[in-house]
């Protein structure tokens, strides 16, 4: 039995609020249960130096957690003077996932910077960030088209992400913190709206997992992501 009484395949309620802030071209508050992440997408003309003159754009991401997003306050990374390895890993994951969804040639020599700030953490912050960032990205691209800055829509497909894992010997979907901290296996899966895999991050935290368990986890992720994409589409409609 899960602490929340959810079934093994049951994700937490997902809520997406668009245009959450006034200034960003795309702005979303996404909630995976008690995990809440603010995702903004900023459209700027021009590209990093390594892409100049190549006729293509760039999408990148930054990620951070507010000091009291967790049970006890933590220092801001700016105050520490450097980002943690975890932060760097997560923001690279978000950037890679979103770049897979964008036709960089259609974007032209423009850059979209995604900022994901965790307001409240209860497990699955990176998967919530990817899911919310995708919706913010859509809004930023639509803004750019409306301004005539790009001619066609560079978005190839929606993407979403969910965590899966083995908790007390049972594969489950969308782990909250109490499950994540005690899971034997922890995995984050990013997929397209049609169920194609973009990235899998999986680790045996306690016991190694079998090939059969891996397939079971991927099936759970596919089912969960399908439901999350439906929420994205409803928010964008």
Swiss-Prot record:
Phosphate binds at residues 86, 124-126. Its EC number is 2.7.7.56. It is an enzyme of class 2 (transferase). GO terms for molecular function: 3'-5'-RNA exonuclease activity; tRNA binding; tRNA nucleotidyltransferase activity. GO terms for biological process: rRNA catabolic process; rRNA processing; tRNA processing. Keywords: Nucleotidyltransferase, RNA-binding, rRNA processing, Transferase, tRNA processing, tRNA-binding. Pfam families: RNase_PH (PF01138), RNase_PH_C (PF03725). Homohexameric ring arranged as a trimer of dimers. Phosphorolytic 3'-5' exoribonuclease that plays an important role in tRNA 3'-end maturation. Removes nucleotide residues following the 3'-CCA terminus of tRNAs; can also add nucleotides to the ends of RNA molecules by using nucleoside diphosphates as substrates, but this may not be physiologically important. Probably plays a role in initiation of 16S rRNA degradation (leading to ribosome degradation) during starvation. This is Ribonuclease PH.
